[in-house]
């Protein structure tokens, strides 16, 4: 089974150009700009390219005083992000960082995270997004394996950085005390006063390197560069066509920015000149309060955060919400329905992976009509579903999912790669295209078990158990079984104050 939305979307320059223009107009990207500011935007892109450096500099030229990001401590404009990032870039250059190097960023969501990312981009260096959950040895392995030249970290990680980063140059992104030490971003910016260095173009565009453990448990760097202008426009417009983001909106960024989904929404914010409202740690009550305080139209989150938002008592005014965009893990069908019943039909669930990027989106209509679906394959994406011999399966049949687009990764920095069929890479899942044209993901290709001669996927049982009112969370795994060959075991977390028994749960899934 092949779904080729790349050919259908971009067949012919006129058709593709009209589609881009229509969506760009709808989201507000074609609003008039003063000629002098338009020239400044063009100069920024020519100097920095279509990188984080270029996009923030262009936004600063267009609307310097617009709010770019708000965290616990401060509100920072686009012009100030541009200025601070130039100061930090100069400090990194003094520490030996240059084009083609890699700088690790070990930080939680904050304005300093964005300043650091843009500063690294201004040097033409790669940004390596380190997981804030890393233990010291994991961090050390990644820094050595990815040939990192410097590290920027929140000072809460000072102990493991000092123990495992060796003699690497380092700067501190967020300092918990808030006293701006000299080797922190805040301290370096304060020492510079109102000035900012005039930096040369690096001549190369750095990459985003996102760490993924896949099925091995060992972090691997998935590198993604800047696609060419046409392919980049097609991919961006396809996503904007599926999820109704608006230019100049306000997004509460709850998802961690060091993961692909959080970084993706940060990038959307760059493109659309959105205000990003974020906090270093997720708290469901705070997220809903921020929607009311800022009149936010979007929340970017992961599914488990939706469950916690549903558990919040009280009712902040969330009437401005138009989008709750989710990715990062499977969305339980019952959770989708309950969330929309409370907050309205605002839920958009995106399916993809760190390596492949975006594959499909299930919007509110999809989730109401077919709650288990991963949605429609995005325009600009090609999907093949194949059997064990790499032959395309018939529509409706389950097979291994391969996908690709201009946003797919270049390969792992180690030189390894995913299993491929031509230009398409394996997602590691099995699924099918239904009669309704929607994609359905049945589970991981290595999760399926054969129990009593039947193919069974843990996700099916997880979805069923999520429908029990006493169940907060569940994980299902396969184990060896003398009678059936293999069987499934469910590990269940009950809600506080509930008392469902094993027999109750067994009866629920029958």
Which residue ranges define each predicted feature?
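Conserved AMP-binding/adenylate-forming
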Residues: 48, 74, 89-134, 455
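AMP-binding/adenylate-forming catalytic core of the ANL superfamily
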Residues: 151, 289, 299, 405, ...
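N-lobe entry segment of adenylate-forming
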Residues: 1-76, 80-95, 503, 507
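Conserved ATP/PPi-binding loop(s) of AMP-dependent carboxylate-activating enzymes
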Residues: 376-380, 391-422, 454-456
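Gly/Ser/Thr-rich phosphate-binding loop
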Residues: 271, 297-300, 311-370, 382
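Conserved AMP-binding/adenylation subdomain of ANL enzymes
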Residues: 230-250, 258-298, 312
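Conserved AMP-binding A3 loop
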Residues: 77-79, 207-234
